[in-house]
From Swiss-Prot:
Keyword Acetylation among record annotations: yes
Gene name, Swiss-Prot/TrEMBL: GMFG
A Pfam family hit: Cofilin_ADF
GO cellular component entries: cortical actin cytoskeleton; extracellular region; ficolin-1-rich granule lumen; secretory granule lumen
Domain ADF-H: 4-139
Protein name from the UniProt record: Glia maturation factor gamma
Stored PROSITE patterns: ADF_H
Keyword Endoplasmic reticulum: no
Distribution of this protein across tissues and organs: Expressed predominantly in lung, heart and placenta.
Stored PANTHER family: GLIA MATURATION FACTOR GAMMA, GLIAL FACTOR NATURATION FACTOR
SMART domains named in the record: ADF
Disulfide bonds: none
Similarity remark: Belongs to the actin-binding proteins ADF family. GMF subfamily.
Annotated GO MF terms: actin binding; Arp2/3 complex binding; enzyme activator activity; growth factor activity; protein kinase inhibitor activity
């Protein structure tokens, strides 16, 4: 059923980049920012970052346009364990054009399935993206 809502396909090059990103060996935070290419009706890579904090990442996101982010985050659990969850963040700022909002919302599920992600979050303003916010969200996954 969700396939009928798909607006945009995922660029095959992006699919391969996401696959490699999933298996990266580095232990720093990293992000892939993606956008919808309206002309091609496709989700494409916009930028890739290494060693980027949540606060730095939010500075890279447009305040008035939606974006998709896959974020590899070094998460230190309360008991001292360290994990590197892959988080999908849908930045859908208030005030976006409705047609743009629909295109991103309709493409989100396909992208999440393609990237095989389970930690899926949404922000309505880039200011929401902080280390505290991310840690709070991740605390639900033990």
């Amino acid at each position: 059923m969700s396939d009928s809502l798909v607006v945009c396909e995922v660029d095959p090059e992006l699919t391969e980049k996401l696959r490699k990103f999933r298996f990266r060996k580095e232990t720093d935070n990293a992000a892939i920012i993606m956008k919808v290419d309206k002309d091609r009706q496709m989700v494409v890579l916009e930028e890739e970052f290494q060693n980027i904090s949540p606060e730095e990442l939010k500075m890279e996101l447009p305040e008035r346009q939606p974006r998709f982010v896959v974020y590899s985050y070094k998460y230190v659990h309360d008991d001292g364990r360290v994990s590197y969850p892959l988080c999908f963040i849908f930045s859908s700022p208030v005030g976006c054009k409705p047609e743009q909002q629909m295109m991103y919302a309709g493409s989100k599920n396909r992208l999440v399935q393609t990237a095989e992600l389970t930690k899926v979050f949404e922000i309505r303003t880039t200011d929401d993206l902080t280390e505290a916010w991310l840690q709070e969200k991740l605390s639900f996954f033990r």
